[in-house]
From Swiss-Prot:
GO terms for molecular function: inorganic diphosphate phosphatase activity; magnesium ion binding; phosphoglycolate phosphatase activity. Gene3D superfamilies: HAD superfamily/HAD-like (3.40.50.1000), Putative phosphatase, domain 2 (1.10.150.240). Hydrolyzes pyrophosphate formed during P-Ser-HPr dephosphorylation by HPrK/P. Might play a role in controlling the intracellular pyrophosphate pool. This is Pyrophosphatase PpaX. It comes from Bacillus cereus (strain AH820). The lineage of its organism: Bacteria, Bacillati, Bacillota, Bacilli, Bacillales. Its EC number is 3.6.1.1. It comes from the Bacteria. NCBIfam families: HAD-SF-IA-v1, HAD-SF-IA-v3, HAD-SF-IIIA, PRK13288.1. The active site is at 9 (nucleophile). It catalyses: diphosphate + H2O = 2 phosphate + H(+). InterPro entries: HAD-like_hydrolase_sf, HAD-like_sf, HAD-SF_hydro_IA, HAD-SF_hydro_IIIA, HAD_2, HAD_sf, PGP-like_dom2, Pyrophosphatase_Ppax. Transmembrane segments: none annotated.
Length: 216
């Protein structure tokens, strides 16, 4: 079966939001729980939904913590977000070659749109599925299934690209092929343990991989 659809995670995959996310967590946690959290303590919070993360910290303050996080994140977004090498050119080429491309993210739509506009990627994506559009987040298959449905694509014709185990396992649960990115903050070995079909060292590695898959 040939691949005609590529789904991407956003944070840490298409755009480098790591410093923004870490700073947003540290600001929020220092505000409510001074001197209790260091940088290394918040690294595991990258990937899960804000609700899941803050529920484990303080069940009684979840919405308050999310509001604080999102306010800081919004205010400092453009100064702390960077593009990854070859992302723009690769997505542009995928569109030129006729691939359907979508984003599946656990972020809220407003922040997603800010990131896509800043990186000038907003012109390319046919479908963007955010946490606002689903009941369940990755690794549950629902977000990927929704994106595939909106794109008119089948799982066996799709590839999911991401920087976290939620993306790889989410793709596996939905029945797509999977590609992990080696620039993940979690480290290459961490993602290799989840057995993605492919490992990308830069986003442009996608192009020869897809070409090979569609030739065989």
């Amino acid at each position: 079966m040939k691949i005609n659809t590529v789904l991407f995670d956003l944070d840490g995959t298409l755009i480098n939001t790591n410093e923004l996310i870490i700073s947003s967590f540290l600001h929020t946690l220092h505000t409510y729980y001074p001197n209790q959290y260091k940088r290394e303590d918040v690294l595991p919070f990258i990937g899960p939904s804000l609700h899941d993360t803050f529920s484990k910290i303080d069940e009684s303050k979840v919405e308050e913590l999310i509001t604080s996080y999102r306010q800081f994140n919004h205010d400092h977004h453009d100064e702390l977000v960077e593009e990854y090498e070859t992302v723009y050119e690769t997505v542009q080429e995928l569109k030129k070659q006729g691939y359907k491309v979508g984003i599946v993210t656990t972020k809220a739509r407003q922040t997603v749109e800010m990131g896509l506009k800043l990186s000038k990627l907003d012109e390319f994506f046919d479908v963007v599925v955010t946490i606002d559009d689903v009941e369940h987040v990755k690794p549950h298959p629902e977000p990927l299934q929704k994106a595939l449905q909106l794109l008119g694509a089948k799982p066996e014709e799709a590839l999911m690209v991401g920087d976290n185990h939620h993306d790889i396992v989410g793709g596996q649960n939905a029945g797509t092929k999977t590609a992990a990115v080696s620039w993940t903050l979690k480290g290459r070995a961490y993602l290799e343990a989840y057995k993605p079909d492919f490992m990308l060292d830069k986003m442009s590695d996608l192009l020869p991989i897809l070409s090979d898959m569609n030739r065989s």
